[in-house]
Swiss-Prot record:
Top-level taxon in the UniProt lineage: Bacteria
Organism: Bifidobacterium animalis subsp. lactis (strain AD011)
Localization annotation: Cytoplasm
Matching InterPro entries: EF-Ts_dimer_sf, Transl_elong_EFTs/EF1B, Transl_elong_EFTs/EF1B_dimer, Transl_elong_Ts_CS, UBA-like_sf
Designated gene of the protein: tsf
Involved in Mg(2+) ion dislocation from EF-Tu: annotated segments: 84-87
The entry's keywords: Cytoplasm, Elongation factor, Protein biosynthesis
Main localization category: cytoplasm
Pfam families: EF_TS
Upper classification of the organism: Bacteria, Bacillati, Actinomycetota, Actinomycetes, Bifidobacteriales
This protein's record includes keyword Isomerase: no
Protein name as it appears in the record: Elongation factor Ts
Length: 285
């Protein structure tokens, strides 16, 4: 039997990210053959990954990029989740997030399903993520994905602390003139979390729910029925100002709205997206 040296263990650990005992067992089973040991770790790891899927993965990072495209520019952002911030801030995890992003861009993915189905090395992104769960020893998953297009796309990536990778990414697509204030708009999206670009983008069922709640609240407060409609409209406008990007007060100068910024440069905001780690609809999975 070949000697299992510290150098061999170190080599396999660096190449796989697996724990010391897992590496030692794999090398022993493989009789010191590094390639075979890596195969064993991969095979056993994928089996272990299935057991991890029920564990919560709400930490992680967001990888993002802008590329030139037929539309002018296209912005991509992918959230990769782990269970702990300890794993999320490791160079290997951050590099893997960048790899998933690159695979998504190369495949021209439009949604998470397309990201997971995208080719990646010897298989798909889905398979690579399963292997990553084994290598990092945690449940790893693709949490969110966003893609926007326009003549110009601006991205702002926010870090909660200098040692952590980005936890919020804001992307905004504008026309050429609007690019002059796109960075400020992206900062606003990151900080204030707008949900829609214009009030026309707010789904009718959401508006009706807000209208109903505002009406019931006004009546419960004992407001005279004849002035309730006016109060309701005021509360609806407040809802729009809080949740519609172009109607939000500019955080650096509340006397202006984000819409005013674009008017000042004669530009337009066309679309935006905001991803925050752990905030996917299925983030509790």
């Amino acid at each position: 039997m070949a000697a299992i040296t510290a150098a061999l263990i170190k080599q396999v650990r660096e190449e796989t990210g697996a724990g010391m005992m897992d590496v030692k067992k794999a090398l022993t089973e493989a009789d010191g053959d590094v390639a075979r040991a890596k195969e064993i770790i991969r095979a056993k790891g994928i089996q272990a990954a299935g057991k991890r899927e029920g564990r919560k993965a709400q930490e992680g990072t967001i990888a993002s990029t802008v590329i030139d495209s037929a539309a002018g520019q296209t912005g991509y952002a992918v959230e990769l989740n782990s269970e702990t911030d300890f794993v999320a801030k490791t160079p290997k995890f951050i590099d893997f997030a960048d790899t998933v992003l690159a695979d998504a861009v190369k495949a021209g993915a439009d949604d998470i399903d397309a990201v997971l189905a995208a080719p990646s090395q010897d298989g798909t992104v889905k398979e690579a993520v399963e292997e990553a769960s084994a290598l990092f020893g945690e449940h790893v998953k693709v949490g969110q994905f966003a893609k926007i297009e326009g003549p110009k796309v601006e991205i702002y990536a926010h870090k909660k602390s200098v040692e952590m990778p980005p936890s919020i990414v804001a992307m905004i697509a504008t026309d050429e003139a609007g690019a002059a204030v796109a960075h400020e708009a992206a900062l606003q999206i990151s900080a204030m979390g707008a949900q829609w670009l214009t009030r026309d983008d707010v789904p009718e069922d959401v508006v009706e729910t807000e209208r109903r709640v505002a009406t019931e609240k006004s009546l419960a407060e004992g407001k005279p029925e004849k002035i309730v409609p006016k109060i309701v409209e005021g509360r609806l406008n407040a809802f729009f100002k809080e949740n519609v990007l172009l109607e939000q007060a500019y955080v650096k100068d509340p006397s202006k709205t984000i819409g005013d910024l674009f008017k000042e440069v004669g530009g337009q905001a066309l679309a935006f997206a905001r991803l925050e780690v752990g905030k996917a609809p299925e983030a509790d999975a």
